[in-house]
Amino acid sequence: MLSACGHSKQMEIKAADISDLEKNRMDVAASQAFTAEAVNIGEGISSADMYIEHYQKGKLVERFGPVRADYSEEKTDTIQFVYFENEEGEGKNKHTTIHFGIVDKQGTIAADSSVKRDDSTTQEMTQNISSPEPITFEKPALIGSSIRGTDETMHTSEHKKELIKHQDALLYYVELHH
């Protein structure tokens, strides 16, 4: 078996290491919040994107973003991707507001979107990336999902096809570019 000699670590995406205090701040800010981070990025990066796909009954109904951070001038080894979801309004005016963005040592790039989700749903499940996974340039990585349904058995999954089968699904993606 051949192995590359070197000290470069593999690029990966994982749940961000955040302190209890930071977690508590996020809990105050939103009903659902999550931060993922890409690490060991190296010099090859030119930009990073974060976007959300909204599906209802298997059909893409809208896409939010991307928000993009430019790294063509100043490189970074670690980038965090964060999102916050909040339910707002009542009855017909009920909607989910999502704040999402990219955070690094240089600052933040953020976006807000208001999503009309299926109100007839009675169950919700959220799943976020939990263990480190390899990430490569030019390939979207799913970092989280929020699925809703009625009485059917709900399953979280790492597979897009399974997630979008539900009555309502938000899929959170990040992508790094050369």
Curated annotation (Swiss-Prot):
It comes from the Bacteria. This is Uncharacterized protein YgaN. It comes from Bacillus subtilis (strain 168).
